[in-house]
């Protein structure tokens, strides 16, 4: 587990925000003081990014394919700057995620917002992932028979 | 690795594609008809010391593939340029594809291109005080049937001689985009400049 630096904390909440739907973000904001006053510095705008991979995590890098990404950068009236990069073309999601990123850096509102929105969204996303993993695990094939035959 | 966060307070183009295309077209027209004043950057509010036309030219032309060198006077705008253009910065003027300045730098220190690839020469984006008054120059060269006129305040007194030396190396040499307020004019390396008043 990496040390809990401000950098890592922000990386975590940005990842959680990027996976949350626009409606979830809007509901979270509405429950914690509403949408702040902000100005869009850039976007929201959609584009393509090349996703790269390495075979086995250590091989030569190759281009896996392109994916659509929407990004947005906002600046709140208090001067906090929030960034968001989200998968797909949902401009509203990117804008709300950027606004939340800016608010989460706010020394006054940040902590309450983190406890009320990020922790809950992270738990929901983890539950969703483990549900998918559980369903996938049920279909896993164990090749006991073949291994035993070879050994014989 | 922790980098200093960029200090950006102002947005770029409201309509990035449309406005960048319009500004690109304005630069093309200005290059094709040296000395002609064209409008660029209306509605854009770049940070000091950039004028709207200068900011628009940067947003339209500069990106991560084109290293930019900043005159020390332009450093306050560095973060805005880095954020909105995604620009890489050159440490030496000679390495730069684009040079942004408020005072005419030594043109011999900028990249003039190579004979195999003269198009790799640097483009100097120079912000001047005015393009409607100041010293008057008569221009001749491709794109001008007889001659063109350019007024500029903020160029050095011996600009015509400096430009003559830049012109002498043709097809190598630096291209110049002059910006002031919301207007710009261009001097491609093919033009000759003669001071009138």
What are the functions of these language-model segments?
Chain B
Residues 65-66, 75-197:
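Internal, well-folded beta-alpha domain core
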């Amino acid at each position: 587990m990496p040390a809990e630096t401000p950098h890592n904390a922000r990386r975590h909440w940005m990842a959680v925000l990027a996976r949350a739907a626009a409606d979830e973000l809007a509901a979270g904001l509405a429950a914690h003081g509403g949408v702040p006053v902000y100005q869009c510095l850039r976007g929201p705008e959609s584009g393509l990014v090349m996703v790269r991979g390495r075979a086995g995590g250590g091989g030569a890098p190759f281009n896996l394919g392109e994916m659509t990404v929407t990004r947005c950068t906002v600046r709140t009236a208090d001067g906090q700057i929030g960034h968001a990069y989200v998968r797909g073309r949902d401009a509203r999601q990117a804008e709300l995620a950027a606004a939340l990123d800016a608010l989460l850096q706010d020394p006054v509102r940040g902590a309450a917002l983190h406890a009320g929105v990020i922790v809950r969204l992270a738990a929901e996303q983890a539950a969703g992932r483990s549900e998918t993993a559980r369903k996938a695990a049920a279909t896993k094939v164990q090749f006991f028979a073949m291994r035993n035959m070879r050994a014989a | 690795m922790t980098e200093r966060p960029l200090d950006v307070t102002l947005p770029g183009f409201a309509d990035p594609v449309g406005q960048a295309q319009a500004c690109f077209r304005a630069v093309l027209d200005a290059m094709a008809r040296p000395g002609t004043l064209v409008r660029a950057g209306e509605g854009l509010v770049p940070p000091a010391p950039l004028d709207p036309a200068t900011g628009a030219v940067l947003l339209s032309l500069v990106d991560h593939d084109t290293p930019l060198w900043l005159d020390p006077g332009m450093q306050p705008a560095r973060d805005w340029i880095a954020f909105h253009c995604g620009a890489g910065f050159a440490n030496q003027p000679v390495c730069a594809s684009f040079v942004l300045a408020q005072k005419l730098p030594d043109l011999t220190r900028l990249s003039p291109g190579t004979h195999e690839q003269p198009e790799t020469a640097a483009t100097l984006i120079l912000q001047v005080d005015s393009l409607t008054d100041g010293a008057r120059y008569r221009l001749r060269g491709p794109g001008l049937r007889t001659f063109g006129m350019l007024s500029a305040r903020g160029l050095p007194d011996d600009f015509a001689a400096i430009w003559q030396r830049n012109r002498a190396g043709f097809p190598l040499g630096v291209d110049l985009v002059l910006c002031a307020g919301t207007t710009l004019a261009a001097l491609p390396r093919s033009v000759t400049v003669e001071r009138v008043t």
